[in-house]
Amino acid sequence: MTDSVGGAFFGRQIPFLELIGARAEHWEKGRAVVSVDVRPELTNSWKFAHGGVVLTLLDVAMGAAARTTDAKGHGIVTVNITVNFLRSSSGLLRAEGRVLRGGRSLVFCEGDVKDVSGETMAIGIGTFRLKKRDGDAK
């Protein structure tokens, strides 16, 4: 299953992801892959991917993986993310999020970001809360 992250990932518009050009490549129960082509406006002063872009990819990939565990279609909000930046990179970046454990309201995930050569540039862990949206059916 694939879709545009900003366009309709899980049927939701996410304007910030449209702005940076993030794309959903794949999602299945407990796993999601998201990518972005690092344009000049997404780089730091050394012309590598800005750390905020890398963190965003991890947040989206892990959050999307967490969301795949919920049969009720709740939204996801980030409770906590810890990221370790291992190396700098640019070009196409791909983040994979994986569920470690899920419960009724919290989902624990891990993820990594790799560059086009397959080198890992960042790893992270995150906690996500399943949250009913106002107006959604129970």
Over which residues does each language-model region extend?
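Terminal targeting signals and extreme-terminal segments of soluble enzymes
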Residues: 1-138
